[in-house]
Amino acid sequence: VAKMSGRGLGHTGGTLDKLESIKGFQIERSQEEFIKQVQDIGLSVIGQSDQLVKADKLLYALRDVTATVDTIPLIASSVMSKKIAAGADSILLDVTVGEGAFMKNLDDARALARTMVDLGKAVGRRTTAVITDMSQPLGTSIGNRLEILEALDILQGKGREDVTEFICELGQIMLGLANVEKTVKEVREHLFDGSALQKFEAMVVAQGGDLEDLYRPSSAKYVVEVTADEAGYISELPAMEFGLFAMRLGAGRAVKTDALDFETGIVFEKKVGESIEIGEIVAKVYANEKISQELVTEFKKNVKISNESKKVQEIIEVIA
């Protein structure tokens, strides 16, 4: 897996920011180092190189001033140009849809997914897109250090069942694209036998990360428990609202030049569809500045509770 990732902006998180919450982790690698690491251990995640698809930055700046940032053909060409230029033989695309995603409705998500898959196939790449739900946060954590800790739980087979199943399904699709036929059950076994965790640790070490720091809990000064004021079932946890809330804690950037606080964020104890009682913990908020009661009230307003349980389907559709 050779992956080039980006940074977060606004309510969206960035893979690079999360990895940089690990002490010493280097996201800048030369092309030679990147290729060698993938050959040696089979895995590397780095930042996007200025030497790759130089025209894309110019085109994005042009889109920004011509009201075409959300034009599907231009989004597709921007995303796929990087994947193709990086040399990937097989490409799995996660196209999110919903309140917290760039694509707000399923028709637009399908159109984007189909366009990118067709572009990949046109240049001889095995390409599949998965349309996934982003109406609520994926997993339980929002925030850089907190998301690394959740990922480590999953890699040790200790993650939430719904997220673990989702990741194993994506893993099966990725392996299929590489002509390795495995069942979801076989993929899951790698989480429980420790081999997936060992591979992640090998990447951290190869890119200068400190393994002791990797497992360190968040050092946020304040941890506030947000509790439910009514009983029922969680019906909404709007991903965008909570992403913006975490940004205000320092976990995200309002503008590209903002500094991040890696330790802050949110950990949900309950997700959509789950039952909750009065006084039960909905989430824990991690902050380095004291959290006001007004902020807690604002958080609670975004947690919707109803009388009926609601099922969330993480993978909505696969387009190949």
How would you name each of these model-derived features?
Residues K18-E28, L62-V69, F102-L106:
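Glycine-rich tight-turn/loop motif centered on a GG-T
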Residues V1-L9:
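Active-site cofactor/substrate anionic-group-binding motifs, chiefly glycine-
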Residues K18-S44, R114-G120, G124:
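A glycine-rich helix N-cap at a beta->alpha junction
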Residues T68-I75, K82-A320:
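Well-ordered secondary-structure scaffolds
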Residues M4, V38, I46-S49, V79, ...:
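Short beta-strand segments
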